[in-house]
Amino acid sequence: MKSIFSYWLICFLFPVIQTPDYSITFSKIDNRVYAFVNDELVFDSQFIDGNPELNLSLDLSPFLKKGTNLLKIQLENGSKLNAFIVDSHWMIRYEIFENGESYDYGYESSKNGQTGLIVYEKEHNIYLE
């Protein structure tokens, strides 16, 4: 009985603080995406041709530290054969989740016929206590 009381006393005095779980899911990548956490590359999709519907998920939690974390998403247009010179179509769609709930998102597509390598870049802040 004493050990049960001690257990609950410890739980009350020292509550377990759970770190939120963060992930990102990409549903469109045309043609290649890079994800950086605090300026460290944590994901490279490689080239994806044909703009298919995707369900690529990445657990961000192992890369996050206490305090403010910067998540940067970059989209590269083109293909392995340097088709970015003439490829004016690009698209990206993704959603960031905190404990399974939508936290933030990004969606853009070529509206101006822009060609080139990095055609999209967006930053998101994630704060951990």
PLM features per residue range, with description:
Residues 7, 11-37, 42-44, 63-129:
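Beta-strand-rich recognition domains
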Residues 1-5:
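Positively charged n-region of N-terminal signal peptides that target proteins for export
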Residues 54-58:
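Short strand-edge motifs at loop-to-beta-strand transitions and within beta-strands
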Residues 44-53:
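Extracellular beta-rich ligand/substrate-recognition surface
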